[in-house]
Amino acid sequence: MYHRNILIEQTDPEIFAAIQAENARQEHHIELIASENYASPAVMAAQGSQLTNKYAEGYPGRRYYGGCEHVDVAEQLAIDRVKQIFGADAANVQPHCGASANEAVFLAFLKPGDTIMGMSLAEGGHLTHGMALNMSGKWFNVVSYGLNDKEEIDYEAMERKAHETKPKLIIAGASAYSLAIDFERFARVAKDVGAIFMVDMAHYAGLIAAGIYPNPVPHADIVTSTTHKSLRGPRGGIILMKAQHEKIINSAIFPGLQGGPLMHVIAAKAIAFKEALSPEFKIYQQQVLKNAQIVAETLTQRGLRIVSGRTESHVMLVDLRAKGITGKEAEAVLGSAHMTINKNAIPNDPEKPMVTSGVRIGTPAMTTRGFGDEEARMTANLVADVLDNPRDAANIEAVRAKVHALTSRFPVYG
């Protein structure tokens, strides 16, 4: 028998120490990685619940195990809520991650050797959209689209390539593109060439849920997403679809790609979806967008170039070449100042992928901890202060002290 008062620190002091150190890092560092956020205590509690013990292969009301009557309730709530958020006909909440969701779509509609079209990773796409080292790039013939001279999606070139190559699947979505995507235009092209149209909205899902970024659901055959990032739920994936695709997608997830779903995570997804339906969530997302625009404007004023010239979302790419520093160096030195960021290639980047000429910045996490206009501007100036003098130890120490003063005023978990 287990006693509920047995704590991690008693069972495994080494893991406890690592968790405590990470807790401290999250509290005392400013999180600027666009794909990271802070889940609510309720979301985290669900993931630590006894639902982790339950096997539930299949779907609500159609399981291969007994004793699923209660986890059925949790999964059905998650399905109903995510459909309500995005206006979808049908939903699958079982994917373990965004990559699994994308792979399930490939399994449902494609055969090895089929042609797919996605945004080039080098110009803002995602590795699961056709990168050579990813399964999507190994199994399928990949045609990529990218940016024009204004660093905006080159819709004309995309349309021309689609008509030339007749892809079986067209993917819209990105991991490092700051502007609004014209999903309706993609849908028209896909219809013209007879392609399935899939949108990966993982980065933008929270903004879409709040109605402040274009919703792809009315236009796409299939929409995939993660449930963390801007949506602020547990780490996991979802697939939204037209009603006619529900059976084939569900079969692709189980038994095609996965076995037992993670019921504790699905319960956490349901909680996150309930949070996303609240008026407070819309206010939060509006501030995420406003903070991003303030950060972009402030960095521009401090002599840095924002790729595409602006942001219309939660994320931006920053070109560092004017400062004579690489993305790899910037990531390290900003980390020393207790601001967490990730190096990222910029369009036509002359540096290697593990070095890069840019960094990616996002505002979901800082906004979750309560940063508003003033704090967003302060954060951007602190980033610029570091990049102006990246090798000055006294400068880094001074910035770090300002970061700690700021984070102490805005704890993540009060």
From Swiss-Prot:
InterPro entries, alphabetized: PyrdxlP-dep_Trfase (IPR015424), PyrdxlP-dep_Trfase_major (IPR015421), PyrdxlP-dep_Trfase_small (IPR015422), Ser_HO-MeTrfase (IPR001085), Ser_HO-MeTrfase-like (IPR049943), Ser_HO-MeTrfase_PLP_BS (IPR019798), SHMT-like_dom (IPR039429)
Subcellular location per the Swiss-Prot or TrEMBL entry: Cytoplasm
Pathway the protein acts in: One-carbon metabolism; tetrahydrofolate interconversion; Amino-acid biosynthesis; glycine biosynthesis; glycine from L-serine: step 1/1
Enzyme class at the top of the EC tree: transferase
Enzyme Commission number(s): 2.1.2.1
Keyword annotations from UniProtKB, A to Z: Amino-acid biosynthesis, Cytoplasm, One-carbon metabolism, Pyridoxal phosphate, Transferase
NCBIfam families, A to Z: PRK00011.1
Purpose: Catalyzes the reversible interconversion of serine and glycine with tetrahydrofolate (THF) serving as the one-carbon carrier. This reaction serves as the major source of one-carbon groups required for the biosynthesis of purines, thymidylate, methionine, and other important biomolecules. Also exhibits THF-independent aldolase activity toward beta-hydroxyamino acids, producing glycine and aldehydes, via a retro-aldol mechanism.
Protein name, as recorded: Serine hydroxymethyltransferase
